[in-house]
């Protein structure tokens, strides 16, 4: 463990969080944020973000505040649907965020009035926790004191708004905000504490909740001793959060939850350092540096990621967070530069949008290069190679070959996943892989599905995003991969080029036998070999699946293996081949037509945001009788 709590006990913190230091930090931060926010209005790189802010402000003048009614709150319990309530909830937060930022830039009276209205609307909500996170069986803690991710975010948001605009807001509004943050968050977490599960969680909840509650305590608690006790407690929670990462810095929840959890960890660390007069720095360990590099390591090209677990392949990274991490690491990032608009984030997160404005440094960004990254504790491999001309890459499995064409200078990439099937936001995806061609995942991971009650309930493996049937892995004797830590990928062989360039010789071999409950299966290994072709004219991925089955006396028991390949691109078939054509690259799979016949299924589905799309499942089946299929 990092043991932040041991390094910074309350007895040590109390002298660093006295009133004088706090007042100085408050004045300096308010001045710096205000100055920087106003400067960004005229800077072209922020134009899209400010257009979103003005669009939301205009809408707020023309329409009333959306209502979070109690019947809407009850809808999750009755139907399992989360989205109807959450859409209104996040619209409220986004509207308030836009109004506050616009008011800081130009404090027109109507804007300040709308800010006050928004603050009062949020203070009157039944609970700040989402219905999906309210524990109805908890008879001790009422819903309005159940502190989840979004209650914590709300407390942080309101505290930071008071920091920025408190002197200009109506005193009754300020008092009401302080009272509600105290009653709904600070009291149940610190002063009359209940134990929340996130306090000892080893995933994003620990960091987000500790950050939100910790920043609210820093900004709103006046007693130095009480503040020190609160911060010590949150540092203990952050110790658990860091324990969820291996020494390789890999995030098993995927890059989206890395942004969420580690991003809020950084936001809290920065605020704690500022409000301790630069005395408390919790970002000094080597492990923090490894975690900070995670997004770069799983980035394939053009803002597209290896998106295992519940993450999107097109994750928009907060430019403020990435800029801050670049400063922490003392180098430019290989990630593409983009300042996200307010409306690009469905959750309209205040913490991200504020820091995108006050922290972003366009000079901190660069461009991706050919490289191999392997995260041994996480079990993920990423290989990136840049082609020099129109070329092809090949993949083979069971004698089949795939060919990918790509344009000159295109980034060709491959990623494979090991790990186990009991990870946070787990998908049953051991041995799954991604093939990437210049900004597109041609063979892909579907990422997160639409969050409902069923998505996090027993039997969730039937959902295609979670099932191994929605990944590029085989179905063995009609069985999918099983859930649980006993299903794990054991690394049998790994070779990565010493120069970390994606050259001949990069390979990974996994034993995946335990992933499948098929009784007849005694051995299943999958081997990947990524090769850059001579002259850097493309790359070849070779996949070899090796199966052994039980025999009955002198004969082997019947068996069958159905290989699956998942893509958002509709494949084209011909005599002995399947091809997936992207915008700049194409994957071609060649196979023995005497032995195999592909079956292609178009599957209608909805993504994490409820938007309909179609993906394509290609299957090729082998069986013990060796008859054509």
Which residues does each PLM region occupy?
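CBM-like, beta-strand-rich accessory domains located in the C-terminal region of large
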Residues: 133-135, 339-341, 390-401, 405, ...
